[in-house]
């Protein structure tokens, strides 16, 4: 299955609670932090909630979906 690289590009200051929790669920903690997630409906739904705070691109290479952690 395809993977997505999700990078937080804007701050969570002043955003709604649901958006902040969606970022945490994706595993994003700070600006310029990236995670690789499996491309599925759940992930797409979380991205839709915070689309103005993140950048999404297809993951390239031998990347595998990872749970939080530092990249």
UniProtKB/Swiss-Prot annotation:
InterPro entries, per the entry: Ribo_uL30_ferredoxin-like_sf (IPR036919), Ribosomal_uL30_bac-type (IPR005996), Ribosomal_uL30_CS (IPR018038), Ribosomal_uL30_ferredoxin-like (IPR016082)
GO biological process: translation
Record-linked SUPFAM superfamilies: Ribosomal protein L30p/L7e
GO molecular function, a single term: structural constituent of ribosome
UniProtKB keywords: Ribonucleoprotein, Ribosomal protein
CC annotations in GO: cytosolic large ribosomal subunit
Domain of life: Bacteria
Pfam family, one: Ribosomal_L30
Keyword presence, Cell membrane: no
Record-linked PANTHER family: LARGE RIBOSOMAL SUBUNIT PROTEIN UL30M, MITOCHONDRIAL RIBOSOMAL PROTEIN L30
Stated family: Belongs to the universal ribosomal protein uL30 family.
Subunit structure: Part of the 50S ribosomal subunit.
Name this protein carries in UniProt: Large ribosomal subunit protein uL30
Natural source organism: Mycobacterium leprae (strain TN)
């Amino acid at each position: 299955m395809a993977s997505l690289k999700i990078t937080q590009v804007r701050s969570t200051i002043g955003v709604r609670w649901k958006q902040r929790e969606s970022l945490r669920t994706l595993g994003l903690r700070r600006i310029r932090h990236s995670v690789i997630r499996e491309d599925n409906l759940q992930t797409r739904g979380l991205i839709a909630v915070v689309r103005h705070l993140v950048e999404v691109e297809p993951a390239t290479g031998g990347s595998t979906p990872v749970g939080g952690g530092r990249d």
